[in-house]
Amino acid sequence: MAGHSKWANTRHRKAAQDAKRGKIFTKIIRELVTAAKLGGGDPDANPRLRAAVDKALSNNMTRDTLNRAIARGVGGDDDANMETIIYEGYGPGGTAIMVECLSDNRNRTVAEVRHAFSKCGGNLGTDGSVAYLFSKKGVISFEKGDEDTIMEAALEAGAEDVVTYDDGAIDVYTAWEEMGKVRDALENAGLKADSAEVSMIPSTKADMDAETAPKLLRLIDMLEDCDDVQEVYHNGEISDEVAATLE
């Protein structure tokens, strides 16, 4: 399956993500601790933990750091007394947004999330208001690669779909519980992915224009700056032309 330029939807956010690397590590460690606490310390027997490990490695976290986080979770560290909360809402241009949080205080978290939505021209919705537009999937990404080789190996390993973008990037989609197994199979075939993570994939896209795109990006940045927010998923689509105006 072919797709538009993936780069257009990521390049304008890379610098901001790099600047937030310390906060990203903190959030990944929190997820590692929680996943190990809830499902045990063996990634092969704990899909949520395996997904967190893959994300940690994709973000260049050292094995020593992630192993310490897993040990904290297995040992009952206080940081593991968290619950996963999903908030749903609408952003600029009618975008559907899902915000995944890990929190020990619902009141604090919902206040921060609601503030970000209202500040950026969006609004927090009710449970189920946009969730039906998203499916939880594993996404294994290659910046470049041979489409036929990756597709053959991925589908043989149990992947659900392979998408090639105009700029040469390739995404392999899997059932989220199977992502680790498929990634291992690809690596055994000599195909090392640039990243692997569990994501919420939208079934429809909302096209952003030069007015709504920066507003959406501001909302995403505000949400990601909240300590309790782990991930922000949305269905906004930014074209190459609009992305060029953001640089």
From Swiss-Prot:
<keyword id="KW-0238">DNA-binding</keyword>
<keyword id="KW-0804">Transcription</keyword>
<keyword id="KW-0963">Cytoplasm</keyword>
<dbReference type="InterPro" id="IPR026564">
    <property type="entry name" value="Transcrip_reg_TACO1-like_dom3"/>
</dbReference>
<keyword id="KW-0805">Transcription regulation</keyword>
<dbReference type="InterPro" id="IPR048300">
    <property type="entry name" value="TACO1_YebC-like_2nd/3rd_dom"/>
</dbReference>
<dbReference type="InterPro" id="IPR029072">
    <property type="entry name" value="YebC-like"/>
</dbReference>
<dbReference type="InterPro" id="IPR002876">
    <property type="entry name" value="Transcrip_reg_TACO1-like"/>
</dbReference>
<dbReference type="GO" id="GO:0006355">
    <property type="term" value="P:regulation of DNA-templated transcription"/>
</dbReference>
<protein>
    <recommendedName>
        <fullName>Probable transcriptional regulatory protein YebC</fullName>
    </recommendedName>
</protein>
<dbReference type="Pfam" id="PF01709">
    <property type="entry name" value="Transcrip_reg"/>
</dbReference>
<dbReference type="Pfam" id="PF20772">
    <property type="entry name" value="TACO1_YebC_N"/>
</dbReference>
<dbReference type="InterPro" id="IPR017856">
    <property type="entry name" value="Integrase-like_N"/>
</dbReference>
<dbReference type="GO" id="GO:0005829">
    <property type="term" value="C:cytosol"/>
</dbReference>
<dbReference type="GO" id="GO:0003677">
    <property type="term" value="F:DNA binding"/>
</dbReference>
<comment type="similarity">
    <text>Belongs to the TACO1 family.</text>
</comment>
<feature type="region of interest" description="Disordered">
    <location>
        <begin position="1"/>
        <end position="20"/>
    </location>
</feature>
<dbReference type="InterPro" id="IPR049083">
    <property type="entry name" value="TACO1_YebC_N"/>
</dbReference>
